[in-house]
Amino acid sequence: MVPVKKTFAQDLFDGIAPSYDTWAQVLTFFQYLRWRRFLVSQMALRPGNLVLDVCTGTAGVALEIAGHHDGRIVGLDASQLMLEAGLRAVEKKDLDGRVQLIQGRAERLPFPDETFDTVVFTYLLRYVRDPDATIRELSRVLKPGGELLSLEFGVPETLWVRALWEIYNRIVMPVMTIPVSRGWHRVGCFLGPSIRDFCQRCPVDRLAAIWLDNGIPPVATRPLLKGAAIVMWGTKRR
């Protein structure tokens, strides 16, 4: 793994790596796996395709892809401890010949231009300073005609759903994570404001414009759980 200078996101996720998959399920009302599966189901992969999974974390998306397609997957993440947990999961499924995990940042991908047939990223843009530049970098390593896909948290627009979302993120999640661990309580306090701020700065139409400006017109946007999560996917111009 290539060492990188520790960032806020790396420090945040290092603190929850051992129990990430379990509590990611609990805190999303057991939607975490369903969202991931829907994301992967939108991929139009062909035999032998090379996929880049950015913010791979514990390699959940990478393993989901490997379970449905015979291509090779490179997972990249800033957190070494998340990657170590992911590597154990990869080896447990005997997929280390097809899934490679490396440490790095989405803003400076260590790959040549037009390397990958598909690039997918999850919960990424809230942690980068310049979403536009990050999408440009992701597009750089994507082959013309290749797919870019993303999964991110959202803020529901329906008033009563938004009210429940606010109660959960402002009160319930910070309190329920206290007995779990210091790392998870930190996440419980951080996540709601982080999502709210990002959705104000980069609503879906703004994200679509960023994709378009970087040669990837989104062909679809799908809200999940009344807008608590959003999947986007599009194809890079040839």
Residue ranges and their predicted role:
Residues 1-44, 60-64, 85, 188-193:
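Conserved class I S-adenosyl-L-methionine
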Residues 146-153:
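Conserved beta-strand signature within the Rossmann-like core of class I S-adenosyl-L-methionine
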Residues 107-118:
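A short acidic, Gly/Pro-enriched loop at the edge of an enzyme's catalytic core
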Residues 50-108:
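Class I SAM-dependent methyltransferase SAM/SAH-binding core
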Residues 118-130:
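A short SAM/SAH-binding and catalytic strip from SAM-dependent methyltransferases
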Residues 132-144:
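A short glycine-rich, Lys/Arg-flanked "PGG" loop and its adjoining helix->strand segment in the class I
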Residues 7, 78, 155-210, 214, ...:
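C-terminal alpha-helical "lid/dimerization" subdomain adjacent to the S-adenosyl-L-methionine
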Residues 214-238:
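Core SAM-dependent methyltransferase catalytic element
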